[in-house]
Amino acid sequence: MLSDYLQTVDWSRAQFAMTAIYHWLFVPLTLGLSIICAIMETIYYRTGDPFWKRTAKFWMRLFGINFAIGVATGLILEFEFGTNWSNYSHFVGDIFGAPLAIEGILAFFLESTFVAVMFFGWNRVSRGFHLSATWLTAVGANLSALWILVANSWMQYPVGCTFNIDTVRNEMTSFWDVLLSPVAVNKFTHTVTSSFVLAALFVCAVCAWYLLRGREQKMARKSIAVASVFGLVCALITAFTGDLSGAIVARVQPMKLAALEALYDGEEGAALTAVGILRPEAERSNNEDAFYFKIAIPKMLSLMSFRDADAFVPGINDLVNGNPQYGIMPTIEKIERGRVAIAELERFKQARETGDEATLDEIRAKFDPDTPEGAVFLKEYFAYFGYGYLDSPAQTVPNVPLLFYSFRLMVGAGCLFILVLAAAWWFNRRDTLERKRWMLWVLLLCMPLAYLASQAGWIVAEVGRQPWAIQDLMPVGVAASRIASGSVATTFFIFLVLFTALLVAEISILCKQIKIGPEKE
């Protein structure tokens, strides 16, 4: 039974990861291209130039293809919370379900309503109403992203909630704390602006293809003029929010930061590793250098993490074994405290079965934040509740090589995109872009790199918080449903075939429409 449940957990993780990866292949383009279409239609509305109407309609056609297929994968992703992660859904459904419900009721219906006007309202409604519908579609798409990212951010940094021992559920106490937590605000800004960059590079890549083939040169140059400026501004914002994210992660998820940097032993004035190759045999328990070679920037990690070049940045060993000098509790003690909290829950369950009201009242007081004993117990023991389900401290260490290389792919690509978009804008402004074929090829190659960087960003976010489904409160190992592993494995392969077919269909349809090009003038 236990071995089958462990297989269920692994298959559920694999299925969710696969679904999320496929879904995120469609989402960034939807978010960014909707804004670009709205900008182009705004230019048409202000100038009355039919060229911009023709251009906007072309990009809307590509947006529509991507939007339709992205919705299908997103619906399946949400259903998996109930089918594969029912323990998680019960434990935090009151909190996690709220933003998802708002996303479905408000954002999704907003974009679903106005997307019809956006596609079929040309020459049927006024220009002003059509422009409003296009902008509302874009706003709706990005509002959907807001609520999904708020829910995800709460998993990374659970705030605005309290634990109800009678229902064994976490319940929301402050909607605004959940919505406006520093993790949520930063994650939304960083994720959405990076999606805008991807969409801008998509537009530039398609236009580069037209210029290489000597087709639709005016449309290509004008589209690059819009996309390069839009993408460059968003790339700079993405870099800024990425820097802020480092400071936030250092405070709320120090193990993630240590794994991203492959920092095993903490240091004052810690250096930031720009590039490096890890030794695969490096282990948590030894102090040898984890790299074959690396190029590091002195004191930069401390400066970026704590805004102090001499600040102490804890390493993996510090977080696992503890470091009394810097007030870091060893993980084994967190595990012991978590087991105390779990034991109290078991006592409560037994007291309820026997009708022992005195014991029930005693334990309720421990879980009540408004009582003196509750204030102490919740801070000293329940704060480490999730650790009680772990077997060893080593389980708190995520996959260091995967995180280390994914992070550098994401950051390196982001820096490259700033340079590429700036160069594209400059050459296009000087009317020399179509003659610089090497630059057109760079724009083409940046499109798949943008998708890789976007996926790498989610690997950093999600693998970096392992083993937690909810940071410090619920490990992934206890979040899954108790269903047969064979059922999850079967649906994994069904979804894999389905999503692959959808992806192939999208690519083929997009390529066909790009070859057809805009409507004839």
Role assignments for model-derived ranges:
Residues 1-46, 54-58, 63-70:
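N-terminal signal-anchor module of multipass membrane proteins
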Residues 1-21, 48-55, 79-101, 153-189, ...:
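Membrane-interface interhelical loops and short amphipathic "cap" helices
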Residues 391, 395-458, 489-513:
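C-terminal substrate/ligand-recognition segments
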